[in-house]
């Protein structure tokens, strides 16, 4: 009985430690980023995190400030973002690196514009 209780406590401790790590992963993604698109243009983005949901700003090529919203799934380090600018929007899907310093993925802009992106933590 004592061994069973010790095993159960160890399992519960591991589970809660994983939850703490998952939240820290989302928190690590908050901050300033540089987004490099497949056409090699580079733009600034800032993200704030609240419980795995992101909000922020993106500066487009015309220097307009655009809104950013999104979410983070800790189990697979997957991030989904949407940038909304005055004349267009972009949907991004990517995966954060283990050290939370880069995010790589793909995007869809307009109706049929697609490509790859890399985000680098500043």
Annotate the PLM regions.
Residues 1-8:
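Bacterial N-terminal signal peptides that target proteins for export
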Residues 9-11, 20:
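Cleavable N-terminal signal peptides
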Residues 23-122:
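Central antiparallel beta-sheet cores of small beta-barrel/beta-sandwich binding domains
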């Amino acid at each position: 009985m004592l061994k069973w209780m010790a095993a159960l406590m160890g399992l519960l401790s591991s589970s809660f430690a994983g939850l703490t790590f998952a939240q820290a992963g989302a928190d690590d993604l908050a901050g300033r980023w540089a987004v490099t698109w497949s056409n090699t243009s580079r733009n600034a983005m800032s993200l704030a995190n609240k419980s795995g949901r992101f909000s922020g700003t993106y500066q487009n090529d015309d220097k307009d400030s655009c809104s950013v919203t999104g979410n983070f799934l800790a189990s697979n380090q997957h991030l989904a973002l949407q940038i909304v600018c005055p004349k267009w929007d972009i949907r991004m899907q990517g995966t954060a690196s283990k050290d939370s310093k880069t995010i790589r993925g793909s995007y869809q802009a307009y109706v049929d514009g697609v490509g790859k992106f890399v985000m680098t933590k500043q």
